[in-house]
């Protein structure tokens, strides 16, 4: 990839324009994504989606744009992505929308913590050493002696 020796976004774009069938295309697309989205803002993810629609990392751009918007933790985020975008993760967003208003409560059994909804149904199995209440969609947990945050799907976020 002599054309990309300087490591700039422009050089990777030029490489793909000159060599669209190159076996190095996946690596070049990854570099384009990484360079273009370095700032990790809504604007750069939107720009990437508009400019690089055939890039293999477009789904990552969509997902990261959605994640950045979720920082506001406002129900309008779900409606915006469902109604006004072509995001490929509509089902995941519908689930997040449903979980947004769900109340999860920590519980303890056999020395481990998990979460249940207000009807008592277990929503996240007890597997944590400690769990706190959800606030703005995240709950502090301790697992294997390490602190972190989980979302209402039970996925580690931080």
Regions found by a protein language model. Give the residues of each.
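Residue-level detector of conserved, function-critical positions
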Residues: 1-11, 23-158
């Amino acid at each position: 990839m002599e054309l990309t020796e300087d490591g700039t976004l422009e050089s990777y774009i030029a490489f793909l324009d000159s060599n669209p069938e190159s076996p190095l295309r996946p690596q070049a697309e990854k570099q384009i994504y990484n360079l273009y989205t370095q700032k990790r803002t809504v604007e750069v993810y939107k720009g990437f989606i508009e400019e690089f629609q055939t890039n293999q990392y477009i789904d990552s751009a969509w997902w990261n744009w959605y994640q950045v918007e979720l920082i506001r933790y406002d129900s309008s985020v779900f409606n915006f992505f469902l109604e006004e975008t072509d995001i490929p993760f509509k089902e995941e967003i519908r689930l997040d929308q449903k979980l947004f208003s769900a109340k999860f409560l920590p519980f303890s059994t056999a020395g481990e913590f998990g979460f249940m909804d207000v009807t008592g149904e277990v929503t996240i199995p007890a597997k944590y050493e400690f769990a706190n209440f959800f606030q703005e969609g995240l709950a502090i947990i301790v697992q294997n002696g390490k602190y972190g945050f989980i979302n209402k799907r039970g996925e580690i976020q931080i």
